[in-house]
Amino acid sequence: MRDSFLQKAIASAKDRTSLLEEIAGNCSPKPGRPSLSSSIREWVYRVGGAVIAEYKRCSPSAGAISTLDPVSYVQATRDASAAYSVLTEPNWFCGSIELIPYFARYKPVLAKDFIVSETQIRIAACMGASAALLIMEALTPRELQELAAAASRYGVEVLVETPDASHAVEASRLAPGSIIGVNSRDLKTLRVDYEAMLREVSKAREQLPGEVILVAESGIDSPDKALKAFKAGAQAILVGTAFMKNPQLREKILAELLQIP
């Protein structure tokens, strides 16, 4: 059977980890990193919802997305974003851990990769990341617990990405205190089902404790879709491709979000 994209990405991440161990041993987590969850809550209080703007130059589903440089991206998104999600995966997403420090000057940074080891979390902390993405489907329950605990030791918050409400509830149980994401993209096939994501966000919001921050991820490429995600129960949305490809669309979405009642 042909390996899924997720299986390939996990294998690649494990190979890269061995190359990162020496770097991790020689670095210290940066002090004074801002809190991702606090920034999201502040935006929810101020305007009713938060945007995590993702810097993503390419992807396995879309190929090359944009050549927009980090300076231009920050200038375009800084005033209306609660945080940045920075792709650090190099092979499919054209990412790098070296991007983190620049974005961390302005907002809390979510380091986004297929994280399978404590080494990756430590390096993210050393580079200035406030939070790290843990993909539930890429980890066993024990691995998720161990990596969440490692993140806590380094002062790194965790966003656990899940495919549906039942996994979201389980993730919150396994990694208490984590931010929970529901992704509309199937990581095995790379297909996006935005409507299914809305249903799962709504179910997750009903089942999760009120203090758990819920994030809607992927497939949000218009103001209407953004607002529907908030109405379904997400406190934050993560938007990548739409912000990278289309400056006009980016401005429309951000302007609309600033008017959330």
UniProtKB/Swiss-Prot annotation:
Pfam families for this protein: IGPS
Catalytic activity, as annotated: 1-(2-carboxyphenylamino)-1-deoxy-D-ribulose 5-phosphate + H(+) = (1S,2R)-1-C-(indol-3-yl)glycerol 3-phosphate + CO2 + H2O
Domain of life (superkingdom): Archaea
An individual GO BP term: L-tryptophan biosynthetic process
Regions crossing the membrane: none
GO molecular function terms attached to this record: indole-3-glycerol-phosphate synthase activity; phosphoribosylanthranilate isomerase activity
EC number, UniProt record: 4.1.1.48
UniProt keyword annotations, A-Z: Amino-acid biosynthesis, Aromatic amino acid biosynthesis, Decarboxylase, Lyase, Tryptophan biosynthesis
Pathway named in the protein's UniProt entry: Amino-acid biosynthesis; L-tryptophan biosynthesis; L-tryptophan from chorismate: step 4/5
Keyword Transmembrane: no
Family note: Belongs to the TrpC family.
Name the record gives this protein: Indole-3-glycerol phosphate synthase
